[in-house]
C-alpha cells in the first residue's frame, strides 16, 4: 500500500510490517527537535526516519535487515524532501552498532520493535521477521541502544503492554533507565494496549507516567491525538 502524509509519501508494499498507528504515534511523540544524529533501528519502510527528518534538522541513519524492506526504505527516502539528510544501512543492527563510528554517536534512537513474542508466525518470511522478537530480542536491542546512544541521548520505543514487564526486566540488566512512559489506549474507557517509552543513560527520579487516548467513545480522534499527529495526517 501507499500512504501520503502532509510532507512525504510512504510506499510499504514489500515491507513485512505496513505503516501503522503505532509507528505514527511513536514518530510524533519522540522528543526529536534538538537531535543532531538519529538512528532508526528496524526501519522498515522508513516511516520513523522520515518523521524524524520532518521534525528535526538532524542526520538520519536507518538500519534495516530485511532486503525488500530496505529497498522500500531507500526508495521512500530518495523521494522525500530530506534525501540528503537520510541514509540507509542494509544490515544487522548488532553488527552495525559495533562499528567504531557509531559507538556513542547518536543522540536519539527510535525503534518500533518486533512485537509478536508467541503464537503462529506470519507465512511470509519478511513479514515474520518484522513481527517476531526472535529476529531482534529485547536484550540484543537494548545492548545495541547502549552501544550507539550518546551519554546525553535518548531512545524512544513503543511496545505492547503485555511485553512491558519482560522488557523492563531486560532493562534492569543494562545501564539504561526509563525516564518517561505513556500508556496508550486505542479507545476511551478501554484498557491501555501500548506503551511509549523514553530511555536514557541518566536516571531521573521519579520518572514520568502519563496516558494517551487515540479515539473517544464516538470513534473520532481525541484532542490529544489530533494535537500529536496534526503535522502528519492529511485530514487533521
Curated annotation (Swiss-Prot):
Pfam families: MTS. Specifically methylates the adenine in position 37 of tRNA(1)(Val) (anticodon cmo5UAC). InterPro entries: DNA_methylase_N6_adenine_CS, SAM-dependent_MTases_sf, Small_mtfrase_dom, tRNA_Adenine-N(6)_MTase, tRNA_adenine-N6_MeTrfase. Belongs to the methyltransferase superfamily. tRNA (adenine-N(6)-)-methyltransferase family. One of its GO terms (biological process) is tRNA processing. Its main location: cytoplasm. It comes from the Bacteria. Transmembrane segments: none annotated. Gene3D superfamilies: Vaccinia Virus protein VP39. Its EC number is 2.1.1.223. One of its GO terms (molecular function) is tRNA (adenine-N6)-methyltransferase activity. This is tRNA1(Val) (adenine(37)-N6)-methyltransferase. It comes from Shewanella sp. (strain MR-7). PANTHER family: TRNA1(VAL) (ADENINE(37)-N6)-METHYLTRANSFERASE. Keywords: Cytoplasm, Methyltransferase, S-adenosyl-L-methionine, Transferase, tRNA processing.
Amino acid at each position: 500500500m501507499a500512504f501520503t502524509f502532509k510532507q512525504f509519501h510512504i510506499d510499504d508494499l514489500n515491507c513485512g510490517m505496513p505503516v501503522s498507528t503505532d509507528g505514527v504515534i511513536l514518530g510524533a511523540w519522540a522528543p526529536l527537535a534538538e537531535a543532531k544524529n538519529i538512528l532508526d533501528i528496524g526501519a522498515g519502510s522508513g516511516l520513523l526516519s522520515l518523521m524524524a527528518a520532518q521534525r528535526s534538522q538532524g542526520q538520519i541513519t536507518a538500519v534495516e535487515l530485511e532486503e525488500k524492506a530496505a529497498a522500500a526504505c531507500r526508495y521512500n527516502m530518495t523521494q522525500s524532501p530530506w534525501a540528503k539528510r537520510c541514509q540507509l544501512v542494509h544490515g544487522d543492527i548488532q553488527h552495525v552498532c559495533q562499528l567504531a563510528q557509531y559507538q556513542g554517536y547518536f543522540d536519539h534512537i527510535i525503534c518500533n520493535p518486533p512485537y509478536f513474542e508467541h503464537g503462529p508466525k506470519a507465512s511470509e518470511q519478511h513479514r515474520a521477521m518484522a513481527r517476531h522478537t526472535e529476529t531482534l530480542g529485547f536484550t540484543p536491542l537494548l545492548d545495541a541502544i547502549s552501544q550507539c546512544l550518546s551519554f546525553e541521548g535518548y531512545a524512544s520505543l513503543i511496545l505492547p503492554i503485555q511485553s512491558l514487564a519482560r522488557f523492563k526486566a531486560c532493562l534492569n540488566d543494562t545501564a539504561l533507565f526509563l525516564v518517561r512512559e505513556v500508556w496508550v489506549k486505542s479507545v476511551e474507557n478501554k484498557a491501555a494496549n501500548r506503551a511509549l517509552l523514553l530511555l536514557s543513560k541518566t536516571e531521573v527520579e521519579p520518572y514520568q507516567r502519563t496516558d494517551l487516548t487515540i479515539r473517544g467513545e464516538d470513534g473520532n480522534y481525541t484532542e490529544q491525538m489530533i494535537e500529536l499527529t496534526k503535522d502528519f495526517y492529511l485530514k487533521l
